[in-house]
């Protein structure tokens, strides 16, 4: 009952015929409700070639999960591969994606934001008043508009199974928040007591923006999303979701709790990278006429 009836029945493209004709007939004969939609996904290929046991290029996911974690693997696959299309897996691209998107963009934004809240406001958030500085007020208003617009683009992408487009929209917003820090320069505002309310507003906008981000990325990187939520000083993560997300959810007086980096940067030498790729490929057996490609599951 937890998994069926299904809104979407996701299958590999090579078995779409069975699951769209034979499977529904079997369900109907048993009086079981049919899925609302059947979606055939593509294959996962490696360096331009289909994964196959005979070629010995099947990548074992277990070592990858142990090394990088499920969040990073899930993000890479869903961001870099359009659902429904064949997608290329590359360990080098995986590491680059972790370092650029997850560590630099997302992780660095969270760390910078919370560090400034702790340094300048003893870890306590208040709404503040961006209007005391016209420039701060203008860019802060843009952050709010961008948050709402990003949420709508994210919803559209998820509803239409364009998960990579949904994630790209979120990362555009994340990068805009990093730019917001550079434009508003909280370290300068902190030196002027007359700009205290503006500083409070900037720090609040950063953390509220991160609250939006945490709920939008939760379907893809749930472990990291919950860590972000907790570091923002928020509770009841399991009750929150992006469907009813509106700006201004962080209450005045919320105390942040900066923690360890959610995605530490990965440093790997090229030669080590090549060795790792080779060691993670298994099933290196002689090619046979019954060679079958391994679909992305």
Q: What role is predicted for each listed range?
A:
Residues 1-75, 92-116, 200-218, 229-230:
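Structured ligand/cofactor/substrate-binding pocket environments in proteins
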Residues 10, 88-102, 149-168:
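Extended, non-catalytic structural segments that build the interaction scaffolds
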Residues 29-33, 115-126, 161-163, 219-223:
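Surface-exposed helix-capping loop/turn segments at secondary-structure junctions
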Residues 41, 79-80, 169, 173, ...:
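Short acidic/histidine-centered micro-motifs embedded in hydrophobic/aromatic stretches
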Residues 42-132, 235-270:
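Catalytic adenosine-cofactor/nucleotide-binding cores of aminoacyl-tRNA synthetases and other
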Residues 57, 87, 146-150, 209:
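N-terminal alpha-helical segment
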Residues 110-154, 174-195, 199:
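Conserved, charged catalytic cores of large soluble enzymes
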Residues 156, 161, 171-297:
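Basic, alpha-helical terminal appendages of large translation-related enzymes
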């Amino acid at each position: 009952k937890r998994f069926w009836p299904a809104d979407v029945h996701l299958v590999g493209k090579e078995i779409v015929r069975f699951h769209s004709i034979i499977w529904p007939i079997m369900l109907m004969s048993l009086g079981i409700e049919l899925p609302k939609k059947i979606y055939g996904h593509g294959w996962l290929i490696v360096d331009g070639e289909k994964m196959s046991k005979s070629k010995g290029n099947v990548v074992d996911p277990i070592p990858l999960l142990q090394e990088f974690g499920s969040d990073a693997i899930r993000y890479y696959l869903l961001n870099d591969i359009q659902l429904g299309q064949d997608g290329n897996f590359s360990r080098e691209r995986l590491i680059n994606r972790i370092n650029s998107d997850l560590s630099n963009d997302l992780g660095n934004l969270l760390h910078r934001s919370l560090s400034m809240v702790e340094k300048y406001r003893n870890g306590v958030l208040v709404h503040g008043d961006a209007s005391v500085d016209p420039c701060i007020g203008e860019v802060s208003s843009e952050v709010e508009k961008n948050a709402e617009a990003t949420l709508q683009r994210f919803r559209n992408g998820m509803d239409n199974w364009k998960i990579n487009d949904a994630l790209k929209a979120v990362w555009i917003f994340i990068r805009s928040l990093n730019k917001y820090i550079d434009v508003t320069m909280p370290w300068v505002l902190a030196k002027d007591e007359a700009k205290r309310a503006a500083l409070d507003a900037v720090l609040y906008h950063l953390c509220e923006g991160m609250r939006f981000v945490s709920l939008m990325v939760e379907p893809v990187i749930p472990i990291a999303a919950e860590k972000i939520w907790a570091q923002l000083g928020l509770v009841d993560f399991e009750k929150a979701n992006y469907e009813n997300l509106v700006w201004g959810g962080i209450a005045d007086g919320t105390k942040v709790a900066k923690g360890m980096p959610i995605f530490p940067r990965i440093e790997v030498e090229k030669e080590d990278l090549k060795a790792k790729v080779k060691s993670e490929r298994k099933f290196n057996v002689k090619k046979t006429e019954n060679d079958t490609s391994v679909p992305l599951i």
